[in-house]
Amino acid sequence: MEAAGTERPAGWPGAPLARTGLLLLSTWVLAGAEITWGATGGPGRLVSPASRPPVLPPLLPRAAENRWPEELASARRAAAPRRRSRLEPLSQASRGEIRTEAAGMSPEGARWVPGIPSPSQAGSARRTRRAQPPSPLERGDSWATALADGAKGSRPHTKGSREEVRATRTGGASTEELRLPSTSFALTGDSAHNQAMVHWSGHNSSVILILTKLYDFNLGSVTESSLWRSVDYGATYEKLNDKVGLKTVLSYLYVNPTNKRKIMLLSDPEMESSVLISSDEGATYQKYRLTFYIQSLLFHPKQEDWVLAYSLDQKLYSSMDFGRRWQLMHERITPNRFYWSVSGLDKEADLVHMEVRTADGYAHYLTCRIQECAETTRSGPFARSIDISSLVVQDEYIFIQVTIGGRASYYVSYRREAFAQIKLPKYSLPKDMHIISTDENQVFAAVQEWNQNDTYNLYISDTRGIYFTLAMENIKSSRGLMGNIIIELYEVAGIKGIFLANKKVDDQVKTYITYNKGRDWRLLQAPDVDLRGSPVHCLLPFCSLHLHLQLSENPYSSGRISSKDTAPGLVVATGNIGSELSYTDIGVFISSDGGNTWRQIFDEEYNVWFLDWGGALVAMKHTPLPVRHLWVSFDEGHSWDKYGFTLLPLFVDGALVEAGVETHIMTVFGHFSLRSEWQLVKVDYKSIFSRRCTKEDFETWHLLNQGEPCVMGERKIFKKRKPGAQCALGREYSGSVVSEPCVCADWDFECDYGYERHGESQCVPAFWYNPASPSKDCSLGQSYLNSTGYRRIVSNNCTDGLRDKYSAKTQLCPGKAPRGLHVVTTDGRLVAEQGHNATFIILMEEGDLQRTNIQLDFGDGVAVSYANFSPIEDGIRHVYKSAGIFQVTAYAENNLGSDTAFLFLHVVCPVEHVHLRVPFVAIRNKDVNISAVVWPSQLGTLTYFWWFGNSTKPLITLDSSISFTFLAEGTNTITVQVAAGNALIQDTKEIAVHEYFQSQLLSFSPNLDYHNPDIPEWRQDIGNVIKRALIKVTSVPEDQILVAVFPGLPTSAELFILPPKNLTERRKGHEGDLEQIVETLFNALNQNLVQFELKPGVQVIVYVTQLTLAPLVDSSAGHSSSAMLMLLSVVFVGLAVFLIYKFKRKIPWINIYAQVQHDKEQEMIGSVSQSENAPKITLSDFTEPEELLDKELDTRVIGSIATIASSESTKEIPNCTSV
């Protein structure tokens, strides 16, 4: 599980969770150089979720000359970065790939208005676009962005000199060029350096720090470095190498997030291990030697002197004096899985959450205080072991993953409460999960399910993060530069509830928008006219606007989509018009009303930045060619003015706009030529704002959703600057919004957990969900909230209306007898070492946790009892003094009933899977052949342990099959355990024993196969659904029907018609009744009356497989002694075996023999064997078990599930590498 959207997630396997404000280091290859921007922390802790653009701490300072006169005496307001969401596996998604386009230079002094051919257009011809390939990241815990060298032949700017361009108009009578005032500075002597890290703190400061370095990719280390400092907003720089030590080679620059005057520099570990500390914004430094090598730093979010350091040898150190002294906290810390406490949630400010690995390879979640982290003072909030790299601490939530028996379970703690298991829809069966966001007391998660390969489903949770419901299926995903997952989902900033998503529909990718957090989605309406003013003929749903939603991996470009909290409703994105998303014929589009309507502003790819609270837009062409112009718009992209910002064309490698929304400064990085020094161009926009804004310069804007004024349960009216008003806002300006609640309507509610939407608004229970079953925490005498199938969307502010109708109703807890009792070990193994702790977990599907007594007998003469489940939630530990085989028995009892569960524990060369083959129904007093198929086949000797019913002593064989006779009618349990070396696995099945029965094979409409995950629970639930459908149509008694769904594809089943439970002496009459029931069922099936709805829009029809109905099978002497019947049986068996061997690939139900399924966990019902499909046919008549797993199968095995070769979906076991 991961938090997506960062390069170093601090969450689930494969992608650590990002944290606020840290150093960025990203590579954007143009000519081999790179630049890195330092924000508020260390290189491994960036935050830039895939669901929204990165909102980062201030980049550029505001110069005093940029202030209006009346503002000079006012205090400087710090720009606070907004809270970020993380997309994590929980996995972590990151920004998208970078592309550039080549295009010719536009005529100077041009002003372009959409509707007239733009300067870059030549009639209808389009220039060839050349993709700019993204480069690899320098390190996995930071971003790197290249500063490219320019083309050869250009005159390099004089080293160390300063170029100044003032705001002027130049040119002859026919042309006139607008100029912006700018200054350029060359970093002298660093032309060989290929990396740079830039920090601009803002906060009433004019200081800029730049660390340039030469990174040798062959050696994997930094060989040269230079530190530059500016005190005049980047107009000039001073080289500080003599102040840090001429021989000191620096590798990283860190800035304290709570006090940006405090700077920390790390030396390259290949040279020395030291840290340089400054408390005056880099003017002076103190150097401290270290006894360990730092890999990453994590600053405390509140205390400016508290720092955590992670070393190269996986040890965690702490400092409480900003790196002057260090103390070892713990060893064997999982990389990136350590977190500071969260204010308001953790009791101690110096508490640290960490994931610690033990010597035996397990991981545990521990917490301790930085100065008190001895073994006696540590605590374990989750007592059991967890999966490695699965701890995520994010806002109010803590996530972990635990894998037992090959299937991962996810747990969440909300506001530091006890951990609860995350509830996804029963058959989502995730093989990968990413946490997208934890904003607004709700979790957004992207889940890749068992039948998905390049798409994810979006799920949203309740406030506690436990119950998840489906918001959108098949969202497109891709891989980033470091192999990280990119989920194409984007949250529009400034207005809550609006998301954009790229969904894969029939191999086409289309862009959808929602205004209510995923309850309803619709396609984007294309613009009415194009850039030339010609009508656009694009009709929904066949044609629409599609957008690229990946955020840029280059922090110095605006990215392909951008929106700001400070400019609500304004969205700029790259995309195309058509039937699907295109990567070639693209342009830039803008929406001024939160995505309702769109206009095209460029027909090529541009970077667009927001200035002065969104009142002005700045655009620069995204191209590898040198440029000296940029475009400015004051009317939300309706018209554009072109300005020159440098005298010589510059190969632009990136640009920084100060994070403060009222800024008028931009810094452009680049080179004038291939071998020139690095150029830093400071561009001042102050001159283009003619005056200060007045009341007459503002207008109101109503947020609508296709004309509906109520969005997320309220009407919102924003005040914004009128398009075209060329005025500047003051620093005291704060965007105003008026809102009032709406009456609750259908669209303010989503389906609750366990319910699915049918039609526009009706929520009905899913086939696997029982809405009448209360929580296990519901104790007799208490009350609980019984869902109506609906829940109000989190953060929706509607009132009255349908709120009472859809709200959950309070009901008394009915009290339930224990059911579904299970006893398992914490690691899922059935082997324990003598003298070591064996920890048991008792699980119960239904019952009253508070009023149920529990007894656990360890099988060695020791037993324990508990009055309720509370003391045993973290497991029951026991140490076995001697080796052997022990039957562990769990017994649960309350005043309504009891339940028992068994586990056979061995203290004993690994086998991976055993499949127990037994008939579903057997005849009393007749031998039943039972066999076990082991995968992979073992060359050595295997020992088989067989338990029948409640027997405490197993039958032990060296053969994989056994014959057994059941003496009494009823349901019997059969368990087999296979021991190979020190490994032990088991399978359990149930068999129904009767005097006689009849059976019939069933098949289904083909659409069921696509939705068949081929796991035991699904087969059991589908069997129950078929049984209910048969009873509904025929009114046959429930206890006389048994439906068993077979493993494998195509999906098939067997219908058993059983005698009544209370069999009397009138046997012949009952046999006649059985024949009548068979005829009734057969007629209903042949008339296609038996069908069920699997999910909305998926109707499944049940058919009779066209084979002869099996005759009555019983245990009477008359039947077994009939010579004629025996002769007919022999003939029929021979014919059947021949036909099966000859045509088994063509008979649908033969798959139940040919496909030995390696199920994801133990079967819940018995699987097919010799007697359920044709009378008197035994397993020996079919292929040997070894052949079942070998050449005769026309199947492929992916993960551990066999599927038909023609199947289009790939089935995999959910992997345990990312939660």
From Swiss-Prot:
Spans annotated as Interaction with DLG4: 1216-1219
InterPro entries, per database record: Ig-like_fold, PKD_dom, PKD_dom_sf, Sortilin_C, Sortilin_N, VPS10, VPS10-sortilin, WD40/YVTN_repeat-like_dom_sf
Renumbered residue ranges of the record's region Disordered: 71-181
Signal peptide per UniProt: 1-33
Pfam short name (any one): Sortilin-Vps10
Localization of this protein: Cell membrane; Synaptic cell membrane; Postsynaptic density
Propeptide: 34-130
PKD domain span: 824-914
Disruption phenotype: Mice show impairments in synaptic plasticity, particularly with a loss of long-term synaptic depression in the hippocampus while maintaining normal long-term potentiation. Pronounced deficits in spatial learning and memory, and accelerated extinction of fear memories seen. Significant reduction in basal synaptic transmission, particularly in the CA1 region of the hippocampus, with more pronounced effects observed in young adult mice compared to juveniles. Altered short-term plasticity, marked by increased facilitation and reduced synaptic depression during repetitive stimuli.
Residue spans crossing the bilayer: 1123-1143
Biological processes annotated in GO: learning; memory; postsynaptic modulation of chemical synaptic transmission; regulation of long-term synaptic depression
Glycosylation sites: N204, N453, N786, N797, N837, N929, N950
Tissue: Brain (at protein level).
Topology in membrane: Single-pass type I membrane protein
GO cellular component, one term: postsynaptic density
BNR repeats: 228-239, 276-287, 317-328, 512-523, 589-600, 631-642
Assembly: Homodimer. Interacts with NGF. Interacts with DLG4/PSD95 and PICK1.
Name by which UniProt lists this protein: VPS10 domain-containing receptor SorCS3
Species of the source: Mus musculus
Upper classification of the organism: Eukaryota, Metazoa, Chordata, Craniata, Vertebrata
Gene symbol of the encoding locus: Sorcs3
